[in-house]
Structure formats: structure tokens, C-alpha cells
Amino acid sequence: MRGFIFPLRQIGIGGSKMKKSKVFITVIAMAVLLLFFFAQGAIVMMTNMEGLKSILVRATVIWLLVIATIVFYLKRNRDLSILGFCKPMEKSSKRVFFYIPLIVIAISHFMCGIDTNKGASFIFANLIFTLAIGFAEEIYFRGIICRIWIDESVKKAVVVSSTLFAICHLMNVMGGAGIAETILQICFAFLYGIVISLVFIIGKSIWSCIAVHTLHDFCSFISIDGSLQMNVILGVIQFVILLCYAIYLSKQLPYDNQDV
């Protein structure tokens, strides 16, 4: 797919210089993403914002990041296919089992029901918010970070992007999540990152990644919180499904790239 791999070699950068360039781009990408994620959480905390207003403010900050990033790449490349904004590879949906495991995991958040007490505005606001998160995280972790490391090896691209994806969820501490809950979420996020990275590499398109990522967060945000026991059981089930799916996806890679 045109533009899928960052063309560092095409502009005369090779060897150690190319690796340093990748590290530099990765650091800058993480810094920009974390800056905006920190900002959206800090604004809410410093202003004691709650409810619908806080969701919309956080969504606005992240959408600003998404729009700014898209504008930057359009001006630089006049094409967003370099970020994976293109049609998925033919038959890639079949190779990733039509994303069914990820859809099942997302819907499983509704085991205790959907929080409808806060009204349609709450659900709509969370849709806007989670869509922003889906775009931002997939653009940066898959479209930028995973993409620039993939020409070295699939394994390195998956591990680097997934590790940073998991670390990024430390920001949830700023959002009020407990330490134990955040640690568990980081472990889950690492495995989830591996799966989404493999989906991205197999399909060479970011659209499906954004869709399933948004669906997962949206279902989680509007679901009713269960008991601790229920959450543990659900977490274990989701983890097992993800692990099996990751193994399955690794076998769908081209033979010369099965190093994950």
C-alpha cells in the first residue's frame, strides 16, 4: 500500500541515522499525544468540571489534536494514506476473522446493563468523546509509531507501539482511576495494543482499528459498573479472548513476517 511504510530510506537516511530518526519521531509523537491527554484531564480537574460538560470539554481537546495532526500530514504529504487512511487490503477482514473477538469483548461490557439514567445526551457525548480517543490513539500508536518501525520487523513494530500504548494508560490515574485498576488496565492495554497492531498490519488500514477501538471504549463508558467479582471475571474472559485472538492473528501474517 502506497505510503504505508515511512520512507526514511527514500530520503537518504540509512543505518543508525534512520534508527535515530525513528526514535526521535516516536518520542515527539508520544510527547504531543501525552501533552493533549494530560491537558484534557488537567482542565477538568482544575475547574472541578463534572458530568456532561467535562466529557464535552475533554472531547474538544482531543479532537483539536486529531484535526491538527491530520492538517499537518495533509500539508506535508497531501495524502493521509501514509497514516493508514485507505481501503483495507482485499480479504483482510476474513483474515482477521471479521473482528468478531474484538466486537464480542466490546459488547461484553454490557453484562451488567447500559447506563440509561443519564439520558441520551450522556450517551451521545460519550460517543463523541470515544470517537476522538479512537482517532487520536490509532493515528499516533498505529498510524505513526507502528508504521515507522515496521520496516525493521513486525515484532519490533508491534512491541514498541503496544508498550507505549499501555504506558499511555497511566494517564488514567489523572482521570480518577485507582492504582490497582490502572495497573490491570495497562496489562490489558498492552495485549489489546498487540491485537490492534496486528489488525493494522494485516489490513494496512487504520479505519477498522479506529472503529473497534471506539466501539470498545464507548461500550465501556456507557455500561453499568458491576461488582468487583464481576469485573474480575469479565476481565479474565476478555484477556483469554484477546490472547487467543493475538495468536490467531500472528498466524495470518505473511510467512516472512511471522516473527511475533
Regions found by a protein language model. Name each.
Residues M1-K17:
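Short, Lys/Arg-enriched N-terminal segments with co-localized hydrophobic residues
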Residues K19-V32, K53-W63, K75-I107, I150-A157:
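Interfacial transmembrane-helix boundary/kink motif in multi-pass membrane proteins
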Residues K22-L74, F124-A125, F129, I233-V240:
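Alpha-helical transmembrane segments in multi-pass membrane proteins
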Residues T26-V27, V96-Y99, F124-L127, K155-V160, ...:
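Hydrophobic alpha-helical transmembrane segments
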Residues R76-S81, I247-V260:
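Membrane-interface capping segments at transmembrane-helix boundaries
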Residues D115-L127, M174-F188, L228-Q229:
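Juxtamembrane helix-entry segments on the extracytoplasmic side of multipass membrane proteins
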Residues A136-S162, I201-S205:
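Membrane-interface helix/loop boundary segments of multi-pass membrane proteins
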Residues T182-Q238:
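Functionally important transmembrane alpha-helices
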